[in-house]
Amino acid sequence: MNNTTRAAIATAAIGALLIPLAGCGNTIASSGKTELTVWSWDASIDRAAKNFMKANPDITVKVSNVGSTEETYTALNNAAQAGNGLPDVTLIEYLAIPQFVHSDTLMDLSKVYDTAKLKDTFTPGTWSSVNINGGVYAMPADSGPMAYFYNKDVFDQAGVSEPPTTWDEFYEDAKKIRATGSYITSDSGDAGLFNAMMWAMGGHAYKLNDDKLTINITKDKGAQRFMNLWQKMRDEDLIDVHTKTWTDDWMKSLGDGSIASLISGAWMANNLLQGVPQATGKFRVALLPTVDGTPINGEYGGSGLAITKKIPDGKLDAAKKFVEYVTTNDEGIDARVSNGSFPATTKTLNQKDFLAKTTLRNADGSDNEFFGGQKYNEVFSQAAKDVTGKWEFLPFEPYARSIYNDNMGPFFSGKETFKAAADKWQKALKLYAEDQGFIIQ
């Protein structure tokens, strides 16, 4: 597949939304300093950049927020198509990296770093996510190992003394919790959760080898395990399929215990603190249940820092320094972790102070024992170690997720089985892939 075709894939996958790209020219500052442009939707990158500039006064870093993740990818695509306006460095979710690799937008960092030595710096799940077809296209900046967040008060009231360790236990606990009037969890149609659960249940539904693409959702063992469980639980009214994720109603239900637990990435901790402060002290965290008790996990979210391929040679050293600072330097990592990001480095995950934390940080900077004094990072750290690296995202993952509910909606509304809905989604993905020039295996 040539670069023109690959660029077209990104265009079709993101859409035609145009976003003005101000201040993104490849210039050297008039002061003689090297000037880097960085795109990030996460404010903690800006904080890290300010610390970086103090230590590197010869480099100016201009961080721009061009919008949401989707808007960032649209802007990247528009700039790549136009041939100008790309940032030098960009934050990018792991799920979107394959798409921009195949549009020839990102630099292979194995050509500018000794990535063989960096491999053990990062967790298995994040390192796997930045490795595409033998190249390394971003440095892991944060991660989202899946964990189980549960309302201990509701569990106690239902007679569930410990969080489930297997999915069979999860199902049995769900019946006890439903008897109290609450649901054990909710899902009204979340493509991110679907993929993360496939990953955590040992699945590997997608495989790309150059232009040859395998999409095998309906026969994938991880997908089958998840769909069988969710089908049974939906049929028995054991999961809330009506409350939309991230809405005020969802937060209210988490706060009052109507939804007793959720499956999410470790980054969810601070979102709970901000979204349901009334539940302070009630929630705990546990490792995600598994099929048979054997440790295995997946990632739900996370992002890396990538250098764009057309960066001027005179800026490359500065970009390398900045990316390395944010992703591997203790000070750079702390600037993000202290503001809610979950680390991707094994060193941070094993630090005594990190593991001993029992508080989250309120917006005013004060400490909050949201998890009732639990050393929650001990759980998250182990969750990160349990992630299997055997996972690949589609080379048009943002598009795939954008049509998930169009195809899966009938399952959540009770009109179709999960497998029937998944089969429709799979067929739509294969048709789209063929339209973009991939050879379906």
Show where each model-derived region lies:
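Short helix-initiation/N-cap motifs at beta->coil->alpha
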Residues: 65-75, 95, 165-172, 242-256
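Short helices/loops that flank or line small-molecule/ion binding pockets
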Residues: 73-84, 103, 154-155, 172-179, ...
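Glycine-centered hinge/linker elements that transmit conformational signals in sensory
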Residues: 174, 212-244, 288
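Conserved N-terminal structural module of periplasmic/extracytoplasmic solute-binding proteins
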Residues: 2-102, 114-118, 162, 292, ...
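C-terminal lobe and pocket-closing loops
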Residues: 268-279, 292-299, 303-402, 440-441
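Extracytoplasmic/periplasmic solute-binding protein
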Residues: 132-141, 146, 168-216, 222-223, ...
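Hinge/lid segment of periplasmic solute-binding proteins
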Residues: 94-146, 171, 197-199, 284-286, ...
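A structural signal for short loop-to-beta-strand junctions that line the ligand-binding cleft
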Residues: 78, 86-88, 118-154, 183-184, ...
